[in-house]
Amino acid sequence: MITGKNFIGNVLSSIGDVTFKTFNPLANIENEIVYSEASEIEIQQAVELAANAFSVFKTVSGAKKSEFLNEIANEIEGLGDELIKVYCSETGLPEGRARGERGRTVFQLRSFANLVKEGSWVEATIDTADLDRKPIPKVDIRKMLVPIGPVVVFGASNFPLAYSTAGGDTAAAFAAGCPVIIKSHPMHAGTGELVASAIIKAALTTGMPNGVFSNLNSSGIEVGVSLVKHSQVKAVGFTGSIRGGRALYNLAAQRPEPIPVFAEMGSVNPVVILPSAIKNNENNWAKTYAGSITLGAGQFCTNPGLILGIKGGDLTNFIQILSDEIIKIEPTCMLHPAIIGAYENNKTKMQEQDGLKTTASLNKDVADNYGKQTITTVEGTTFLNNTALHQEVFGPFSMVVQCENMQQLSAIISKLEGQLTGTILADNNELENYPSLVSALQNRVGRIIFNGVPTGVEVCPAMVHGGPYPASTDSRFTAVGINSIKRWVRPFSFQSWPNDLLPNELKSENPLKISRLIDGKQTINKI
């Protein structure tokens, strides 16, 4: 049952005066439940509990953390149809999307459970002593990754499960040994509370310390600002807009003790069409990209918002077919009024730019909060000279840039900001002819795709979901996959430390039987 209260550790709390409701964009009405925004007192309590819990949780074994993560997954599944119903009522998204996202969420949790149970992720490294070394004896030094401390995670509006309360940021932080405080997204507070209750149940069942998790409601920016500025918070995870992510990044940098903010933000995900791709296949690629642009009402951070090709008859045909196909697709509901408002505003600003031509725009009346898909096109020279055209329009929108030649196309890629993805459509032989183009695109993105679409982010160890700024605040890390755990850890060394007092991961006898780097060689052997 949803209470509308905050979880301050294991305890429900609602002592603040500010309240709010979520919104059903499909019905265009407020939902009934009233939520209590976290007060400063509750924020302080949650952070202090997290700091106290960290002293215990950081020592919890990988096997026990695995049990905790698996139990969270079990409890989320145990929420059954209630979770699906609330999710849909707060997002306007269809039931199939809700069930798919729930599956992704529990898969992420179980992936991290397997990772920490096996244990080698800590990158244990041992350089043994050589007391006979001349002229200076060599001391014994042993290193491993350790948790960074309490983490604040901001729920994402476009993924109420997979990037929110028990999403990838939270799962990775728990796996690392970090307590988590969620700043719940106001548009899906009910979904967040249900998932929070599942986490609390799992924590109680598996004996995790009180404060390992808290869930704070908020309808504005104040709660998030207070959390990021709190001295006992040691890292932040965020998925959302460039404006929001950069504001948090700046706040964290201004603290007396700056902390990392791992923000996944804006991206137009450029798609490069080489001539061979559409010479005889423009129909198929146009249909494919019409579907990708409108998938989920265009509300994916990997939405293909920019398409680059060489001016000519084949590209003209592609633009025409893409425009025709996208208009055939039924529009869908966007997540909440603020998103549809921002989409319409940013789309209008883009369409007002000199030289931009709209080739497809849905003219028929649609229900409230439905996004009308739009295709635009512009000359390469105009695009190069106007950086306003480089900005993201979050929603079912894409721009096709008609470049004069490959040199101009490469110049455009070099001028782009950092992106999550870049895609090249071509045949193998043609791709080999443009190594500098491929290299330029690699410099701008975190993931490069050949003959596919960027929408869809597989949860797997090889995935990189990140990229140069402003796609993310730190291109060295991924927000998806087991390697995302590295955002919430730091390397730590023990020098000449008694073996019996070392963590099990670093003991000479290797009781956990994990893979370790010992004197430069990877092995599971004891010393």
Language model region names:
Residues 3, 15, 287, 309-420:
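NAD(P)-dependent aldehyde/semialdehyde dehydrogenase
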Residues 366-369, 406, 411-502, 524:
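C-terminal core of ALDH-fold dehydrogenases
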Residues 42, 222-223, 408:
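Short acidic active-site motifs
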Residues 68, 176-191, 212, 257-274, ...:
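Short loop-to-beta-strand entry elements in the cores of soluble alpha/beta enzymes
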Residues 120-290, 311-316, 525:
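Rossmann-like NAD(P) dinucleotide-binding subdomain of oxidoreductase/dehydrogenase enzymes
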Residues 51-54, 58, 73-80, 84-87, ...:
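Structural signal for hydrophobic packing residues in well-ordered secondary-structure cores
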Residues 1-139, 526:
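N-terminal Rossmann-like NAD(P)+-binding subdomain of aldehyde/semialdehyde dehydrogenases
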